[in-house]
């Protein structure tokens, strides 16, 4: 029974919270900006639960669809479905339960547009695992998926979708592409052998340069957000300077394209999102 529980925990990546935070941070950025400070506790709690469910659901459906691929990749060869600790049919049921909870959370807001947006991102989440078999930039679609909560926040808070909305969306999408490229650098050799496509393979020898350009773009758009929202100097100190320092550190880590260090670079992005959030919180 214990081993079964561990299998489901690993399937939903409860033991690996970085992915949860990477989805949560942009949601919190939007919540604080739309509320000009601390949002309603119930609204905040509902968004956190929704993010938890959607992140875990994404991991489950990814493992379900990528079962044949995971058997061939060093990093994923011990995943629950691959080793048999969770059956594929069971994984599908877990996915449906998580999606049901997430949809119930959205329905609590009593906003039909938010429900519609949630159904769109659900569709994208199901399609995403297949994309790496056909296109070299699935990271772009992942960026859109991970930025979608920003649109839902603005909808739920009855705020007009404005310049800041799209700047947040764009900054986060670019950020996701760069950090998932760092993640793809970990699996590059395996992906090449089994015919899986990724941005790391697309960018090839200029991967570090492209990541650097994307880092600069992310910082620049954050700077523009600060100007548009008339945020104080504390935002620039934490969000802009803090993120920039971590981006420089990531360049150091990925310099030799060492698998382990590329993974460290990816994981450090949780702190990037946190610093941006802290800067926004201290601004109100």
UniProtKB/Swiss-Prot annotation:
Q: In which pathway does it act?
A: Cofactor biosynthesis; ubiquinone biosynthesis
Membrane topology classification: Multi-pass membrane protein
Q: Which HAMAP family does this one have?
A: UbiA
Recorded catalytic reaction(s): these are: all-trans-octaprenyl diphosphate + 4-hydroxybenzoate = 4-hydroxy-3-(all-trans-octaprenyl)benzoate + diphosphate
Question: Which GO terms fall under biological process for this protein?
Answer: ubiquinone biosynthetic process
Q: Which family does it belong to?
A: Belongs to the UbiA prenyltransferase family.
Cofactor names from the entry are: Mg(2+)
Kindly give the InterPro entries that the UniProt entry links to this protein.
Answer: HB_polyprenyltransferase-like, Prenyltransferase, UbiA_prenyltransferase, UbiA_prenylTrfase_CS, UbiA_sf
| Cell membrane found in the keyword field | yes
Its name, as the record gives it, is 4-hydroxybenzoate octaprenyltransferase
GO molecular function terms here?
A: 4-hydroxybenzoate polyprenyltransferase activity
E.C. number(s) listed in UniProt: 2.5.1.39
**May I have one GO cellular component term?**
plasma membrane
Primary role: Catalyzes the prenylation of para-hydroxybenzoate (PHB) with an all-trans polyprenyl group. Mediates the second step in the final reaction sequence of ubiquinone-8 (UQ-8) biosynthesis, which is the condensation of the polyisoprenoid side chain with PHB, generating the first membrane-bound Q intermediate 3-octaprenyl-4-hydroxybenzoate.
Compartments in which it is found: Cell inner membrane
Ordered alphabetically, the record's keywords are: Cell inner membrane, Cell membrane, Magnesium, Membrane, Transferase, Transmembrane, Transmembrane helix, Ubiquinone biosynthesis
In terms of Gene3D superfamilies, this protein maps to: UbiA prenyltransferase
Q: Which residues cross the membrane?
A: 14-34, 41-61, 93-113, 134-154, 166-186, 209-229, 233-253, 262-282
